[in-house]
């Protein structure tokens, strides 16, 4: 290592004013160069500190590179999320501009609206024709029935091998003797105390529907007494029509002698005269009974109970058909007669009446007992307060 030492300059010499030159040339300074190792301790400490700082600098550069890579990855993810958010914002925030809203002239706006509506209908019909030509089925869309919550007790096919236990239960239930044809149904129809005219007419029309039915006035008797007297007179079922505000609003069906008892809400009652029909069109032939869409275990019991009110051998010559159609836990009742054309190739239905809708409120085991009776099923709350609107029980 080379060390350079600088000698100090001598003090300046005062010159006389009589000298010829105003400026004196400065003498060059001598520099001494020494060769050899440096023995100064401060230099060694500076060298070691420089090495340490170099190593620390390299380590810090490596950390900075890793941090930069992580920051770049995070920035890329943030950019992707921001792009997705921007796409969503673009989809939701862009308003749909209607050209009609910019027109102030009412006549021109109406003419343009009719033109746009006509073009839209024309385009829709073209798409429908193209779809039919290609053989593509139309989209059925969603309904409450298609979105219905699946019930664990749903019965798809009663004759299936998976439903052997259910078949054994049905062979031992309260309606097994009816389906074995061991007796002929006999129905007693009565009313609440002091029924109004419309309620009496409705009970009379029920007697035209149910074969072997008898209508009697209640005479302020309790339901238990009515059941005991009906059992003595060999009635198999009791139907009690309740009323409120001078309208029939409830139906109590009791199967004798051991129950069960079903309470229905009655609504949308239309008598034969209300649908402009004559009761003389209703013949005395035993009708054919159609039970539709009772798919659950509870629905199967209710359907068997309603079917047990009719004779098990219908008379097809009378061409009468009685339908109990369950839809969204509402049971729609219709009474028709099917008529053939002169050629005998086509058939049409003629409604005879009455027409009403049933809604199951409770199903009680045994005969009617409001105090100590056991309920197999009872409605819990109003429809709008239930936990799900897509859950049905029948």
Swiss-Prot record:
The record's listing under Pfam families reads:
Brix
List the GO biological process terms: maturation of 5.8S rRNA; maturation of LSU-rRNA; ribosome biogenesis
Keywords (alphabetical) are:
Nucleus, Ribosome biogenesis, RNA-binding, rRNA processing, rRNA-binding
- Specify the taxonomic lineage: Eukaryota, Metazoa, Ecdysozoa, Arthropoda, Hexapoda
The protein's matches in InterPro entries, at most eight in alphabetical order, are given as: Brix, IMP4/RPF1
* GO cellular-component term (any): nucleolus
Q: What does this protein do?
A: May be required for ribosome biogenesis.
Region annotation (RNA-binding) ranges: 347-364
Cite the record's Acidic residues compositional bias ranges.
Answer: 15-33, 59-88
* Boundaries of every Brix domain copy: 185-369
UniProt signal peptide: none
What protein name is recorded for this chain? Probable ribosome production factor 1
Primary localization: nucleus
């Amino acid at each position: 290592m080379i060390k350079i030492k600088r000698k100090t300059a001598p003090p300046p010499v005062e010159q006389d004013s009589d000298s010829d030159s105003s400026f004196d040339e400065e003498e060059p300074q001598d520099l001494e160069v020494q060769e050899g190792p440096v023995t100064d301790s401060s230099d060694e400490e500076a060298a070691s500190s420089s090495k340490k700082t170099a190593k620390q600098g390299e380590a810090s550069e490596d950390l900075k590179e890793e941090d930069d890579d992580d920051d770049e990855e995070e920035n890329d993810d943030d950019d992707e999320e921001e792009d997705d958010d921007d796409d969503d914002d673009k989809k939701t925030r862009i308003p749909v501009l209607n050209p009609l809203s910019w027109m102030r002239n009412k006549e021109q706006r109406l003419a343009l609206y009719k033109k746009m509506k006509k073009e839209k209908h024309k385009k829709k019909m073209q798409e429908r024709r193209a779809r039919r030509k290609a053989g593509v089925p139309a989209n059925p869309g969603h309904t409450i029935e298609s979105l219905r919550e699946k019930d664990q007790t749903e019965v798809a096919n009663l004759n299936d091998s998976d439903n052997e236990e259910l078949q054994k239960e049905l062979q031992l239930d309260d309606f097994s003797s009816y389906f074995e044809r061991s007796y002929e149904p006999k129905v007693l129809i009565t009313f609440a105390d002091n029924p109004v005219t419309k309620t009496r007419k409705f009970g009379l029309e029920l007697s035209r529907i149910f074969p072997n039915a008898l209508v009697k006035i209640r005479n302020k008797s309790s339901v238990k007494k009515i059941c005991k007297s009906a059992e003595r007179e060999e009635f198999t079922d009791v139907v009690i029509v309740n009323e409120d505000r001078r309208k029939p609003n409830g139906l109590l069906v009791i199967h004798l002698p051991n129950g069960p008892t079903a309470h229905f809400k009655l609504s949308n009652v239309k008598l034969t005269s209300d649908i402009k029909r004559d009761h003389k069109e209703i013949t005395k032939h035993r009708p054919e009974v159609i039970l539709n869409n009772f798919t659950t275990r509870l629905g199967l019991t209710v359907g068997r109970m309603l079917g047990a009110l009719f004779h098990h051998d219908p008379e097809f010559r009378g061409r009468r058909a009685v339908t109990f159609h369950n839809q969204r836990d509402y049971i729609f009742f219709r009474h028709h007669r099917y008529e053939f054309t002169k050629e005998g190739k086509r058939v049409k239905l003629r409604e005879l009446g009455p027409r009403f809708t049933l809604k199951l409120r409770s199903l009680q085991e045994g005969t009617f007992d409001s105090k100590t009776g056991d309920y197999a099923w009872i409605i819990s709350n109003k429809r709008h307060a239930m936990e799900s609107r897509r859950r049905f029980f029948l």
